[in-house]
Amino acid sequence: MKLACAQFQHEGDRASSLDKAIDWMAQAKGAGADLIVFPELAFDFFFPQVRADERYFDWAEPIPGPTTERFQAAAAQHKLVTVINVFERAAPGRYYDSSPVIDADGSLLGASRMLHIAEEPGYNEKFYYWPGDTGWPVYETRAGRIGVAICYDRHYPEHFRALALGGAEIVVVPTATSMSEQAFRDVWEIEVQASAVANQIFVAVANRAGLDGDLQFFGQSFVAAPDGKVIARARENEEELLVAEIDRQDIERVRRHVPFLRDLRYDLYGPDRR
């Protein structure tokens, strides 16, 4: 099968960005993709770089809502499993950074909410987001069993481990990682490769690209295989539709050769063992 990471730069307004994203879905399908993942908040200005501005709460929408429903229609049209990311309004005063997961028939399978919320220069997220409460769902899709790690979640190995133990074959990572985060950029691929090989899963990272306000998103989206190797990598700073061919049977082959999960004593790692 093939998966696509949409290394995307928003167009200055949501309507134009959504039009472009839908066109990219058609391109991905034309390239043979079965799954496409878009970056974090790809269709809007990355507002968390602005500290404590209540106006941005007006940008949030429910799930399902207008953005999700538009992607549901496109997913059904192109028979393409689709993972996006939106600013979710779940209830009055309750907002999340969320990734709806849409199957190839257009059905909304659910949404994963970012569990770990950052607070650092350029990423003033605690003002805007509640900590996610969805846990680690694994979605049964036509492209396989998919889990989601949104941006900051990727820094926590426990997140990938929970998804792998839940049966995930592919973990997708919608992110908005910029050049201002030098410490994160230094480990950009290494930490994901480590999680891929430790759990013997595929990981697909979709980053934003280009200048957005004060942040320069550097792109370099990539796909890591169950043996930890990077098998596809996008350009730096520029938009690109990265399409990678993967074989989910590689998971079985790697786990037979080195059965990390079989030998894991997770019964020893409960909260009462800390």
Model-derived regions: residue spans:
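Active-site-proximal beta-strand elements of phosphoester/diester hydrolases
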Residues: 1-12, 17, 37, 98, ...
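Cys-nucleophile CN-hydrolase/nitrilase-fold catalytic domain and related Cys-dependent amidase chemistry
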Residues: 14, 25-105, 177-194, 198-201
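Short, acidic/polar
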Residues: 16-27, 156-161
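Short beta->alpha transition motifs characteristic of CBS
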Residues: 48, 100, 111-118, 222, ...
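CN hydrolase (nitrilase-like) catalytic-core segments centered on the catalytic cysteine
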Residues: 63-83, 145, 154-241
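Active-site catalytic loop in hydrolytic enzyme cores
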Residues: 73, 90-166, 179-194, 257-260
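Short beta-strand scaffold segments in enzyme catalytic cores
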Residues: 84-86, 98-101, 137, 221-223, ...
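A short C-terminal boundary segment appended to hydrolase-like catalytic domains
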Residues: 249-274
